[in-house]
């Protein structure tokens, strides 16, 4: 019985491959209990608002406490603590402000009116397509609009791609589904043919995912287009809940949440619940500042807005946030639709989590160093500047735990303290939990329970963010990796040796600190912090052991049939010919050149619909 309950609780990604499109605007109700509770409860409960207000008070009280000059200790540890704490206080304040800004917001009357007119039941009846919602024409401002659905593929398993494509094709509203294959796979091409969707691959790989999309926009000419990663399965009402926002000609894109269905181990649960706060509260609040940004998948774009900035931004692996900020600088509006309209996979290994966070953090630091939102050259409103500055500095909160680990070490070995001994223990007991305790309580209320996995990942991710900081500072290019996909066969320890050595050193420091306290006849607070840091580092090491053991068992049960990332499953196309410019986006929109080159290579031979598109 307990095994059955666990399987229901941690159900994997919703399978929409056999979705029945005959039920008008139906949702597939395949929710685990946690998902159902989230979907049937309001985002802002009275308890949540109370805890948020108390957390805000805790932020201000703790700030006043740590900035009191009389409490200052030795300079070096004091500077470390002040720097880290002020970063955390700033980000906590921004999160609370943004979250409370979105309180009580509902879809506008304008959206509801456009949604009511999106489909024409009388016309559908005359055309005898009432029973097939995938063929229903969509209308905005009394004119028919067309939508392309672009599914970016880069070596994912065929069964994952098939499920995603079938769900995309089953969405209500007339649209055209495309597979954008950057893995040069004949198997994917054959899958597209068997499913009846369109397929395109390009000659070359410049611009990574952004280049792949720009290349497809040369042949996919719809007024609007949707982007899905290969592992995100759309619900049938995706277009119904997003296209009506485009009734406002100033809206550049409509972003929807990333919801995960594979929360079945420590890493995936930690990574998934970290993102839940962002999508349930932060992004909706950013709507009020016109600063909600694209996250790369589950998003509807207006083609004219993308053309206005020269195409999806290709000069960064974090093309999504760069594209967003460029659009906002051009005066476009963005919308975050908080309804959960697609289900995908979050990283479930230390490798995939590390690569994802490295890419995201590098993109944030790149903006800070090369396109700082606070610069007078940025054409943003002040509230947009503040929101984007909070975004690109967010990953400093991941570096802070690593720096704070140095503080008890300095006290144990050098007798250097961040605060004077005049600070009583009960003062710490009042102000410290008032800040950190309320933050943890707030996260627990949002998630519905205390999630120790979130703390585990937060405490152990500092090497990733330090590397991202220097990658951005020194302009080191990082290899593209697919977000949400399970990593390769490498050991988890290949991606966390810094944490392993930190654990060994912290364990030794804890032993020294305990012996020191025993010799002096009293317990020092540094011992507590050493033991706590040792515990979190050790727990991460154990997580790596468990992950390696599980993957070894899986390999013993069956052969790994997943193709390597970015390696062609068949003979690749001529890699010397590029279809996407590395520096000038508009060249990626030259449809005739792309079609001629692909036709010459036989890429379109298996899919005559693309030839028809050209004609």
What is each model feature region?
Residues 181-188, 204-205:
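A conserved acidic beta->alpha catalytic loop
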Residues 142, 164-175:
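Short, acidic, metal-binding catalytic loop of nucleotide-sugar glycosyltransferases
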Residues 229-233:
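The conserved acidic donor/metal-binding loop of glycosyltransferases
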Residues 2-137, 192, 387, 397-398, ...:
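N-terminal membrane-anchoring/stem segments of glycan-assembly enzymes
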């Amino acid at each position: 019985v307990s095994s059955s309950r666990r399987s229901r609780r941690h159900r994997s990604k919703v399978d929409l491959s056999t979705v029945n499109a005959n039920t008008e605007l139906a949702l597939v109700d395949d929710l685990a209990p946690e998902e159902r509770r989230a979907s049937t409860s309001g985002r802002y409960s009275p308890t949540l608002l109370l805890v948020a207000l108390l957390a805000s008070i805790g932020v201000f009280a703790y700030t006043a406490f740590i900035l009191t000059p009389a409490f200052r200790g030795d300079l070096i540890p004091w500077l470390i603590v002040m720097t880290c704490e002020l970063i955390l206080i700033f980000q906590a304040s921004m999160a609370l402000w943004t979250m409370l800004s979105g309180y009580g917001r509902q879809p506008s009357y304008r959206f509801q009116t456009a949604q009511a007119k999106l489909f024409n039941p009388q016309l559908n009846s005359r055309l005898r397509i009432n029973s097939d919602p995938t063929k229903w024409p969509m209308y905005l401002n009394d004119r028919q609009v067309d939508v392309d659905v672009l599914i970016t593929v880069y070596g994912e398993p065929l069964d994952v791609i098939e499920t995603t494509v079938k769900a995309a094709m089953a969405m209500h509203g007339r649209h055209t589904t495309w597979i954008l294959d950057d893995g040069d796979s004949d198997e994917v091409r054959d899958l597209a043919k068997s499913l009846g969707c369109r397929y395109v691959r390009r000659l070359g790989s410049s611009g990574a995912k952004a280049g792949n999309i720009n290349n497809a926009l040369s042949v996919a000419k719809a007024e609007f287009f949707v982007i899905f990663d290969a592992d995100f399965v759309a619900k049938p009402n995706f277009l119904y809940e997003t296209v009506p926002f485009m009734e406002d000609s100033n809206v550049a894109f409509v972003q929807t949440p990333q919801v995960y269905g594979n929360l079945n181990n420590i890493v995936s649960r930690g990574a998934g619940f970290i993102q839940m706060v962002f999508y349930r509260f932060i992004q909706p609040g950013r709507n009020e500042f016109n600063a909600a940004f694209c996250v790369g998948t589950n998003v509807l774009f207006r083609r004219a807005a993308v053309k206005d900035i020269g195409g999806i931004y290709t000069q960064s692996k974090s093309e999504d946030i760069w594209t967003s900020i460029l659009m906002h600088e051009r005066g476009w509006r963005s919308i975050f639709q908080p309804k959960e309209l697609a289900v995908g996979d979050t990283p479930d290994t230390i490798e995939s989590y590390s690569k994802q966070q490295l890419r995201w953090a590098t993109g944030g630091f790149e903006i800070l160093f090369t396109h700082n939102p606070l610069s007078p050259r940025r054409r943003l409103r002040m509230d947009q500047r503040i929101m984007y500055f909070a975004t690109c500095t967010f990953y400093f909160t991941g570096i802070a735990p690593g720096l704070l680990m140095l503080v008890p070490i300095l006290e144990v070995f050098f007798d250097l303290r961040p605060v004077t001994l005049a600070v009583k223990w009960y003062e710490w007991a009042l102000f410290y939990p008032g800040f950190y305790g309320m933050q943890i309580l707030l996260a627990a209320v949002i998630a519905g329970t205390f999630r120790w996995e979130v703390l585990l990942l937060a405490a152990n991710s500092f090497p990733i963010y330090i590397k991202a900081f220097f990658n951005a500072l020194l302009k080191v290019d990082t290899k593209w990796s697919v977000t949400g996909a399970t990593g390769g066969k490498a050991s988890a320890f290949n991606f966390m040796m810094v944490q392993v050595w930190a654990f060994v050193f912290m364990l030794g420091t804890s032993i020294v600190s305990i012996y020191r306290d025993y010799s002096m006849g009293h317990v020092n607070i540094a011992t507590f912090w050493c033991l706590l840091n040792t515990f979190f580092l050790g727990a991460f090491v154990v997580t790596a052991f468990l992950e390696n053991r599980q993957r070894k068992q899986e390999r013993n049960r069956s052969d790994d049939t997943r193709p390597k990332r970015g390696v062609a499953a068949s003979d690749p196309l001529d890699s010397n010919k590029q279809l996407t410019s590395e520096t000038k986006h508009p060249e990626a929109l030259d449809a005739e050149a792309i079609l001629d080159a692909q036709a010459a290579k036989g890429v379109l031979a298996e899919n005559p619909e693309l030839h028809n598109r050209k004609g």
